[in-house]
Amino acid sequence: QGPVLGFDLDVVITGSLDDLLALAPGHVVMRHDWNEARKGRPTGHGSVFRYDPLEHPFLYEDLAADAYAEVERARGSEQRYTSHKAMDNSVFTYIPGDWVISFKYDCNPFPGNYLRPATLPTAAKVVCFHGRPKMPEAIEGYRGSLIRYAKQTDWLQDHWVDRTRADLGAQWG
């Protein structure tokens, strides 16, 4: 009962989630998809989302009623389905862009990625690792691509590994 906060597996929590839970009560909340935003299109990104099953039954009911048609309409994208259904029902709000950020676009942008290690903006609550580098690659440093090059990222080791181990105990990982 109450809101559900969902995460992809390729994210790291770096700040308090209280603001995400309090943002726009009664609305589905997602971050604006980076690629769709650049193209001027309205679509949420599914890496972090909040909804309430009791307040947003249409997310399940419409899909259950005609799954094939709904998947076709959303072009196979669960984030397009979720965000557009909520928009159609006037219960959608974007998460502020500085709360849920992209490692490659916001922490480690080209060409600065060659000059300094990735930075963690102070307002960031969640960092998403969509594409390369993957989280383990970013910790160690990544040399697989000109624009995705990353120096060793110590703050990621701290937030993703060390704090998780402290929370879950030495037997983790």
Task: Describe these PLM feature segments.
Residues 46-60:
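Conserved nucleotide-sugar donor-binding
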Residues 7, 43-47, 78, 122-123:
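Residues that flank catalytic or metal-binding motifs in active/ligand-binding sites
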Residues 21-22, 40, 47-49, 65, ...:
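Short, surface-exposed, charged loop/turn segments at secondary-structure junctions
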Residues 1-43, 50-51:
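GT-A fold catalytic core of metal-dependent nucleotide-sugar glycosyltransferases
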